[in-house]
């Protein structure tokens, strides 16, 4: 006898949703679909984050949803839609302009504002990225390890990863116009 849900109870690392799509490949109610990403399509693998550590909170509540279900299987969505905000699947697919952008600094919470449910935060799920290594500053917290698509690892703050535009320049795992305004 095997349980129906064979997922690990929780994991400490997460992928970049612009490369790792969620396990939802077609939903009639959404404007866009997830697509599998071949590593050969990445424009700048040495400058594109593949994975990072989750923010460790009390009883891992930072990676739980409001119903207290652990969502550590979800990748981090680094971008927001120009018109849809964090609801990236409902961003229109048409037009020649970039439809996604990096969140503003104001969407990255200071350490004192971090709490439960960061994995489902309405501003950006980037707030669920770890900040528990040395470095960083008193306001935003410490650093995290980031694995890049070419295999190297770098330690930096979540804010630095956003300011340096290291999560990519396309929402590779999203159908339609997936350009990011960098």
Explain the meaning of each model-derived region.
Residues 1-182:
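Short, well-structured segments within or immediately adjacent to enzyme catalytic domains
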